[in-house]
């Protein structure tokens, strides 16, 4: 029998949840879960590692020839470079459109859940123990900026967003919202800017063109800001299940939110009203969780999920095509190279594909 799940409210009061929001399982069990790879796997208790003999010594990720094949949870473009992050503190990068990958030296063995670049050189990665890492050379080297191992027993940050090389936000478990205006030299706990008394997990943050910032999370929670995150409005969303991702589009005010069981919603008024987007597979309604995605340079949108699902839209999310990759490996995030080929990450590491998500290319 599992222990009751307790959560601190913003007032500091301990509150028992009616239903456990997340449970800790083995990494394999979480990979195979129907929930989002990004949000569920990020709560896996990190694998035990041998403690450094000197408690003050920095513990680096272990070099591995298979780092690009390990569980990876997010990927982003740093100029023409591709950078991906994931399990055991692995960060890998490629300068040849994903043909070959180099493992970066990273000062952690904690699971890294997300990353974002403010420009070609300045990037941030977040993960367990409320960890934030930063790079100033496009992902070649990394340094720790922030960590809070005492925060909710090492609960993770789940997403990070940067406007430029100075202004950014990190969001995560138990309502975590942290802000910086100096490139991460200082991080401010900005959770009290949100009306989130139950401390729902915040799973994703994005910018919506011409409108502002948007955050989604547990229990269908939604928040928007029109003033660069200084103040936030709580919205009544279209769905009471967990939302794992949110994307702006090339169309001003248009935003997509997605999560469990293939649920995908579109708004053209910055989240005031929503329309469900029906996506069908050859066997009927898409029933796999959707976990991550990206607005690509050409204005198209890609969303990925469990079971190798790859959704693609060229009309700002009004309609989507769907393919289920033959390997059926769960996917957590995606981007594209300069030729328009999709580069997917998740179970099995990096998958370089055609623009539709098919025709995997071998890694080296």
Q: Where do the protein language model's features map onto the residues?
A:
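N-terminal secretory signal peptides that target proteins for export/translocation
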Residues: 1-26
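Residue-level hotspots at or immediately adjacent to binding/recognition sites across diverse folds
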Residues: 2, 49-364
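Bacterial N-terminal signal peptides
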Residues: 29-46
């Amino acid at each position: 029998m599992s222990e009751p799940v307790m959560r601190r409210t913003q007032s500091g009061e301990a509150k028992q949840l009616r239903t456990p929001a997340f449970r800790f399982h083995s990494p394999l069990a979480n990979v195979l879960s129907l929930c989002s790879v990004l949000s569920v796997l990020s709560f896996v208790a990190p694998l035990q590692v041998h403690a450094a003999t000197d408690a003050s010594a920095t513990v680096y990720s272990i070099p591995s020839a298979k780092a690009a094949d390990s569980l990876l949870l997010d990927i982003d473009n740093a100029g023409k470079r591709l950078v991906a992050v994931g399990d055991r503190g692995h960060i890998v990068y490629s300068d040849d459109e994903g043909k070959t990958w180099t493992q970066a030296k990273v000062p952690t063995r904690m699971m890294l859940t997300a990353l974002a670049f403010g420009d070609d050189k300045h990037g941030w990665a977040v993960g367990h123990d409320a960890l934030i890492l930063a790079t100033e050379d496009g992902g070649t080297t990394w340094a720790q900026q922030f960590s809070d191992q005492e925060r909710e027993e090492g609960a993770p940050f789940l997403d990070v967003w940067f406007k430029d090389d100075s202004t950014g936000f990190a969001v995560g478990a138990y309502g975590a919202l942290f802000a910086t205006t100096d490139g991460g030299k200082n991080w401010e706990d900005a959770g009290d800017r949100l009306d989130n008394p139950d401390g729902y997990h915040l799973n994703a943050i994005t910018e919506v063109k011409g409108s502002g910032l948007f955050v989604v999370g547990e229990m269908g929670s939604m928040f928007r800001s029109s003033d660069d995150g200084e103040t936030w409005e709580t919205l009544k969303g279209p769905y009471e299940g967990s939302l794992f991702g949110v994307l702006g589009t090339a169309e001003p005010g248009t935003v997509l939110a997605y999560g469990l069981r293939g649920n995908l919603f579109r708004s053209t008024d910055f989240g005031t009203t929503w329309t469900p987007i029906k996506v069908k597979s050859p066997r009927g309604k898409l029933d796999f969780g959707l976990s991550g995605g990206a607005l690509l340079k050409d204005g198209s949108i890609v969303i990925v999920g469990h079971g190798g699902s790859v959704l693609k839209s060229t009309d700002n999310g009004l309609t989507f095509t769907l393919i289920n990759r033959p390997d059926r490996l769960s996917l957590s995030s995606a981007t594209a190279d300069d030729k328009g080929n999709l580069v997917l990450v998740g179970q099995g590491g990096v998958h370089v594909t055609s623009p539709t998500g098919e025709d995997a290319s071998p890694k080296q």
